[in-house]
């Protein structure tokens, strides 16, 4: 007589996720949707230009299309109320990030590249906004500290993976298309935990309880935060877009660009822990003002010195501060809108994205007119100081 084999119960199949699983899954999701789907383009661009004849104007247009995709994703997220649809869109973003990264290898036709870069930008929005909103909502429902510092390790790790991965892949597979395909395969390593450990959709009673919490977002507060976050986006994209170019244009620093970009990511990873601690001690607004001040200094350094030390210190300062500004700002606005943190984050991010589209154009025109980036760096420092002044008008958040 054979023993009857009972199927596993629903409880066994759907065990509650642990905090480390949700965080690690979110980190892997960020590496996939930001580090690969968005940032792999930066270190792979030189090979694409050398081997396909892609000129600077067309390369810049692809970057703009990518930012356009990010803005489109932020717009969708800003008007998405149903948590189930936010969860579905985030899940689709994980698949799209994997496929669009590999698809870049299939053709050297510019319109095809533009399509994949647009979708890659869309994926970035799902990881940055929907993923962070889902994780923050899960933390609040579990009664845990509603901070996103650990989650945003994925941003720094994504930069490191894209920078060092491209350097290694170029030595093994010199062809640009092989490198894109290899990044797509590499994405599977991050896709699996990101997919398996997605924050679950809250049950109806929990969702209703959170939805009952009144939002704490006055119009003046939101506009002030949006304008200061615009300044942060300006500072972020100038360094993210031109750091490698600025370094490579210094004769004494030629060939060091990829290492400087990797240093940005290495600085960002531990910094997220530090900024959460700083915010607990000083309050969120004061911590943000400190991050703005330090990032301004890191932007000015390459403008006043062309030394390798200035490039490295500037990269360290930039990596350590941009991640703090993003993490503290999104967590702050998410806590003030517990019924739909992802939606509130997305609306704020529209100003950050607008700066990402405008700033490179202004900086590029200034660099073309002056023959260098110093003027653009000084303008960026002024914009960052204006953002810090706006923050000073807000009541502190302890």
Give a label for each model feature:
Residues 285-329:
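C-terminal transmembrane helical hairpin of 12-TM major facilitator-type secondary transporters
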Residues 116-154:
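Cytoplasmic helix-loop-helix junction between adjacent transmembrane helices
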Residues 73-85, 271-283, 367:
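Helix-to-loop junctions at the C-terminal end of transmembrane segments
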Residues 72-109:
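Conserved MFS/SLC helix-loop-helix module at the cytosolic interface between two early adjacent transmembrane helices
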Residues 110, 141-199:
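Helix-loop-helix hairpin linking two adjacent transmembrane segments in secondary transporters
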Residues 339-372, 380:
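A late C-terminal transmembrane helix in Major Facilitator Superfamily
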Residues 42, 221-262, 269-270:
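Extracytoplasmic gate region of multi-pass secondary transporters
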């Amino acid at each position: 007589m054979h023993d009857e084999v009972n199927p596993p119960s629903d409880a066994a199949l759907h065990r509650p996720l642990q905090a480390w699983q949700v965080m690690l899954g979110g980190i892997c999701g960020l590496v996939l949707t930001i580090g690969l789907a968005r940032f792999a383009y930066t270190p792979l661009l030189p090979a694409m230009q050398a081997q396909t004849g892609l000129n600077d104007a067309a390369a810049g247009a692809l970057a703009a299309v990518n930012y356009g995709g990010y803005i489109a994703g932020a717009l969708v997220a800003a008007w998405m109320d149903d948590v189930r649809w936010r969860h579905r869109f985030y899940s689709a973003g994980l698949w799209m990030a994997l496929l669009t990264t590999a698809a870049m290898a299939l053709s050297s036709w510019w319109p095809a590249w533009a399509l994949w870069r647009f979708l890659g930008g869309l994926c970035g929005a799902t990881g940055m906004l929907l993923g962070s909103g889902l994780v923050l909502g899960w933390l609040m429902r579990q009664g845990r500290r509603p901070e996103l510092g650990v989650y945003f390790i994925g941003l720094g790790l994504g930069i490191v993976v894209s920078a060092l991965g491209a350097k290694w892949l170029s030595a093994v597979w010199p062809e640009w298309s092989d490198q894109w395909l290899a990044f797509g395969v590499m994405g599977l390593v991050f896709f699996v935990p990101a997919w398996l450990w997605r924050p679950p959709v809250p049950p109806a009673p929990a969702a209703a309880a959170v939805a009952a919490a009144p939002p704490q977002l006055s119009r003046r507060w939101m506009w002030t935060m949006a304008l200061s976050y615009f300044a942060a986006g300006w500072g972020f994209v100038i360094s993210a877009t031109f750091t490698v170019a600025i370094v490579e244009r210094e004769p004494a620093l030629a060939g060091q660009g990829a290492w400087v970009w990797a240093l940005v990511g290495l600085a960002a990873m531990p910094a997220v822990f530090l900024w959460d601690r700083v915010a607990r001690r000083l309050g969120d607004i004061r911590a943000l003002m400190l991050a703005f001040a330090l990032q301004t200094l890191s932007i000015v350094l390459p403008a006043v010195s062309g030394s390798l030390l200035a490039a490295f210190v500037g990269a360290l300062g930039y990596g350590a501060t941009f991640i703090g500004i993003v993490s503290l700002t999104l967590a702050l606005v998410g806590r003030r809108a517990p019924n739909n943190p992802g939606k509130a984050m997305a609306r704020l991010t529209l100003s950050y994205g607008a700066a990402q589209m405008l700033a490179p154009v202004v900086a590029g025109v200034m660099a073309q007119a002056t023959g260098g980036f110093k003027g653009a760096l000084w303008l960026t420092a002024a914009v960052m100081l204006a953002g810090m002044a706006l923050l000073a008008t807000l009541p502190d958040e302890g």
